[in-house]
Amino acid sequence: MAKKKNLTIDTLWKLQRAGAPSLAPDGSQAVCSLGSYSMQDNKSASALWLLSTLGGAARPLTHCGDKDGQPQWSPKGDLIAFVAKREQQGRKDDEAQLYVIAPDGGEAQRVGDIATGVEGFRWLPDGKRIAF
């Protein structure tokens, strides 16, 4: 029998943490954020991961955001919206902004530039607009 190890604070900080998943409209995939933390740097980072509900390996969808999170599928399933603090076109977000990305990957596109940042957004049923 394997020797039991105590759970320490250092071990807890090393664990990656999954954020709330969002299920694709057809139910075949889910997307969630996966966060990691560095006690040494006192910094956190997160990326979006795509998971098949039919089995198979999860794959990263985003790589370069500071805090990619709160993913939501569009009603048609052709886009995933999320909030993030990123650097794009030589400009770094001061506050979390709204981005969209296709589920098959590519570069995420900033939807707007909101001085106070974006939280708590929702797709409208037409899949063309997002309210926040």
Cite the ranges covered by each PLM segment.
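A short helix->beta-strand "capping" segment at the edge of beta-propeller domains
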Residues: 1-16, 53, 58
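Beta-strand-rich domains and repeat architectures in extracellular enzymes and scaffolds
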Residues: 10-46
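Hydrophobic beta-strand positions that form the internal "hydrophobic ladder"
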Residues: 27-30, 77-81, 130-131
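A flexible loop/linker signature enriched in serine peptidases of the S9 family
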Residues: 34-47, 62-68, 83-99, 107, ...
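Short loop/turn segments that connect beta-strands within beta-propeller blades
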Residues: 52-56, 102-106
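Structured, non-catalytic alpha/beta "coupling" segments that mediate domain-domain communication
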Residues: 123-131
